[in-house]
Amino acid sequence: MLVGREKELHLLHDIQNDDSSHFVAVYGRRRVGKTFLIREAFGYRFAFQHAGLSEGGMKEQIYAFTSSLKDAGYEVKKQPQNWLEAFEALKDVIRLSSEKKKIIFIDELSWMDTQKSDLMVALENFWNGFASARKDIVLIVCASATSWMLSKVVHNKGGLYNRLTEQIHLRTFCLRECEAYVKAAGLALNRNQILQYYMIFGGVPYYWGFLKKGLSLSQNIDSILFEKDAPLRDEFKYLYASVFKKPENYVKIIEALGTKKVGMIREEIITATKIPNSGDLTTKLEELESCGFIRKYNAFGMKKKNAIYQLMDCFTLFYFKFLKSEPTDEHFWTNQINTPAVNTWLGLAFERVCMEHVDQIKFKLGISGVLTEVNSWYCKSDPDNGIFGSQIDMLIARKDQVINLCEMKYSQSEYTITEKVDRSIRNKISDLRVVSGTKYAIYPTLITTYGVVENSYSQELQSVVMMDDLFA
């Protein structure tokens, strides 16, 4: 069942019907649906398809590639000894194909690029010297190692420089797309339940496929994560290992960021992980960011050299909070409902979901067309200078000289702004003005699930964004 992806499907269908050859790179995080999209788009019909091995050296990779050549109907008379020979055989498969458009799909390309294999040399030769000279080939390469795809294919500085005709960065579902999936699957979940499931798994389509009819949301979560043989109980063990060949230091970074809600600057990461300050650390941070596990941002008014790295992956955050301790209660989630631990987590997770739906928030605020920067901001208390000490998790700084200071509050009913909350908002506005020196107008903005209870304090809000608006 393919839900959403209309833009990507339209592009792939146009490519198939075009009268020239195309070289397409498809990338995105693990389990986002890249392979499924490509198979559905082309009706599972390929002149040749192959998936790299997660383990194995050059010899094993070429052997598997040769097996795929045989599956395509090619009679292999001699086992290829290198990638140049393997791609020569692929040329013969194409020459023998009767398909009007020869769709060549190579999945998990990064796994095939073993040490000193010269895979990219052979791929370059295949495209530049053969496929691009024809009009009937669509070459699609795909990998979950987003950073590898970006450096080796999309931004290739060698023979494949500027050779891609299309690239598709397949992103996770937004809430609207998850709701469409739930409806298509015939699941009876309301928007608050969809939101809560999103807080755990984000918009990764694969995870949504485990929901079962007839079970409540909490029963589903227990079945998927906490029962003895739950299918995703050990997911964290594979999440990073499947993307990075040597995941240990990546996981160290993730674990360090998981201890600090607002994130860490580079120096703090070095101190926490004991990873040396080097270009290798820079690469690992960039790779984690490109895969969507973390985000890099600059606190409002701060210099770029003090960039902050923040853990964003919903499942990883949930793992650290509830799964890392390996609870033995098979009904753990059902029994944890309305506990302080879960209520605290709901608030933090809701903030992350809001950060992933900035476009929807901007649409509700009527500023979709306004150039903006989305930041977080904090300052320490300094009573002598009238500074209270504030942490603001979302600031939308607008080109029209307005800042939306966003308070994100998860609630099971309409949210009530008390005197304490009102004072906190006023203090944040004051701190932001004093410390940053901004001259922008500051609009207090509430983002919550079911709106706000009308009282004297709520009148001070400039805008209210509700859960339904995040589904736009």
Describe these PLM feature segments.
Residues 358, 390-412, 425, 444:
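Conserved catalytic cores of phosphodiester-cleaving nucleases, focusing on short active-site segments
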Residues 27, 31, 111-115, 119, ...:
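Sensor-1/coupling segment of RecA-like P-loop NTPase cores
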Residues 168-193:
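Conserved small helical "lid"/interfacial subdomain of P-loop NTPases
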